[in-house]
Amino acid sequence: MFGLKSKTLTGTGSVVSGPTRLVKLYLVGGSSAGSVVLKNGGASGTTLFEMATPAGATLTQNIDFNDEGLRFETDCHATLTNITSITFLHG
């Protein structure tokens, strides 16, 4: 897949404005358990991905989505709880 871009967040916010496919994410957890929720259509949009993260200030997780990626028709918004940072690869 060509034309990929990356975006790093350290708190809740917009990953990208406009349609995109998320192909990978890499996160660094916080000292207590947390979560990542990805929505299409802003903070109150439709949840397309949700995961819990265990406690661990040095915890890292790498998530690969399938070849098609996770499609966001409108935009991609991330709600982060107890996440130090998260990097998205999208295009």
Predicted regions and their residues:
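Surface-exposed, low-hydrophobicity beta-strand/loop segments enriched in small/polar/acidic residues
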Residues: 1-91
